[in-house]
Amino acid sequence: AAIKQALDSIAANPGFVSMPNGDIAEQIKSGDVIAGISGVWDVMNVKEAWGENYGACKLPTYTVAGKEVQMSSFTGYKMMGVNSYSKNKEWACRLADWLTNQQNQELRFKEKNQGPSNSKAAESEEIKKVAAIQAIIAQSQYGTLQRVGNSYWDACKKFANTVLSGNNGGLSDQEVMDTLVNEITASAVK
């Protein structure tokens, strides 16, 4: 219940606005959003709106039951795979090697500001200067590997809508939290 109350407090703040993924970029460009929480997928939009000197940091802390708690996040990675049963396996392997080589990962970084997965490309001094990548590195100690199914996203969307509406639908805060947990952990097989 304390977590639900903390989230209610955040959502009730007049400076807080929730918006669908993708909308934050448009709101930044229009000047309606001056700070926000998003992912590296929005870096190019942020750079376009705010310039090269934009700032980025790890997620903030918030207060739950009188204690400061660090917001957590999901972490993930990009992976290049090749189907071993492909009739063009050799060409698929060559394409994977080409896409993940140092030169192309450096090009991807330059054009998309995405951190490279190639270890040699990742050693670049230029990467150490990118605020968004440094923020991800700082946040990574609070992250959890993203291994969730659709039941997680559906349950969290329903929970977020409840928090944002300020209406528990007659349920106590604890009942709302219990429903969230039950829906996340429910088997996909019915």
Where are these regions (language model features)?
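Stable alpha-helical elements in mature extracytoplasmic
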Residues: A2-A6, I24, D42, N88-A92, ...
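Pocket-flanking alpha-helical
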Residues: A25, D42-A49, T185
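Conserved C-terminal helix/tail region of periplasmic/extracytoplasmic solute-binding proteins
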Residues: I137-K190
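Glycine-centered hinge/linker elements that transmit conformational signals in sensory
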Residues: A1-P20
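Short helices/loops that flank or line small-molecule/ion binding pockets
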Residues: G22-D32, G36, S165-G169
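Periplasmic solute-binding protein
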Residues: A1, V69, F74-N83, W153-L164
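Extracytoplasmic/periplasmic substrate-recognition and gating elements
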Residues: E48-E111
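Paired acidic/hydrophobic, glycine-rich loop segments that form the ligand-binding mouth/hinge
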Residues: I34-G39, G55-A56
